[in-house]
Regions:
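Conserved ABC ATPase "signature" C-loop
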Residues: 206-207
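Catalytic Walker B motif of ABC-type/P-loop ATPase nucleotide-binding domains
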Residues: 152-155
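A short, surface-exposed alpha-helical micro-motif characterized by mixed small hydrophobic
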Residues: 194-196
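Helix-to-loop junction immediately C-terminal to a conserved catalytic motif
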Residues: 41
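Conserved ABC ATPase "signature" region
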Residues: 104-122
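ABC ATPase NBD Q-loop/coupling interface
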Residues: 50-67
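Conserved ABC ATPase signature
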Residues: 127-131, 135
Length: 215
């Protein structure tokens, strides 16, 4: 039975995503953007409907659910608050280590991910807590990129950064997309960023997908 507090966070939301697309997602606070993102990489399980990755329901098998969390990378808003390791290198390596990769492959991924976001070799050996806010943001994004996800979902990746830092982060994200033919799904309140970068725009309102079109 329903309760007085029950709320449908997403209603009749259906769309397909192609490899290599850059998709902008916009909507007012409470429109369902964060809920949508967390469904796409298996953090939340839909009470109705399904999430398909390469045509397979990610909840049909525990192995597929686990794989989806590596293949669909999720960067929360202000991800720098989730840094915890003693060096930048170790923080970026955390995800690849959890994937069970060998040390040489982990090292390759860490250095490549650092390169994508503009982290230098010298910075890899310092504490992430000694870096500026913008640099911490880069480290946090690199930690997800190092898992080489097919789909990279980002919640306001440029929030709180100065104009130069904002532009750098967005360029880094697009460079990853082009290099790996990855799909980017980016939540943003900046219509100019979305219009400039996206191939496609999803607009959520009142828990429903109201627009799915080119910007």
């Amino acid at each position: 039975a329903g309760t007085p507090f029950e709320h449908v966070a997403l209603k009749d939301v259906s769309f397909c995503v192609e490899r290599g697309e850059f998709i902008g997602i916009i909507g007012h606070t409470g429109s369902g953007k964060s809920t949508l993102m967390q469904h796409l990489n298996g953090l939340l399980k839909p009470t109705d409907g399904s999430v398909l990755l390469d045509g397979q329901d990610i909840w049909s098998d525990k192995r597929l659910t686990k794989q989806s969390r590596f293949r669909v990378g999720l960067v929360f808003q202000y991800p720098e608050y989730q840094l915890f390791e003693e060096t930048v290198y170790k923080d970026i390596a955390f995800g690849p280590k959890n994937m069970g990769l060998d040390p040489a492959e982990i090292d390759r991924r860490v250095r490549e991910a650092a390169g994508f976001v503009g982290i230098t070799e010298q910075q890899l050996e310092v504490s992430p807590f000694d870096l500026s806010g913008g640099q911490k943001r880069r480290v946090a994004i690199a930690g997800v990129i190092a898992m080489e996800p097919d789909v990279l979902i980002l919640d306001e990746p440029a929030a709180g950064l100065d104009p130069e830092g904002r532009e750098d982060i967005l360029k880094n994200i697009d460079a990853y997309r082009k290099s790996k033919n990855a799909t980017i799904m980016m939540v943003s309140h900046s219509m100019s960023d979305v219009a400039r970068l996206s191939d496609r725009l999803l607009v959520l309102n009142g828990s429903e997908l109201v627009i799915d079109d080119t910007p």
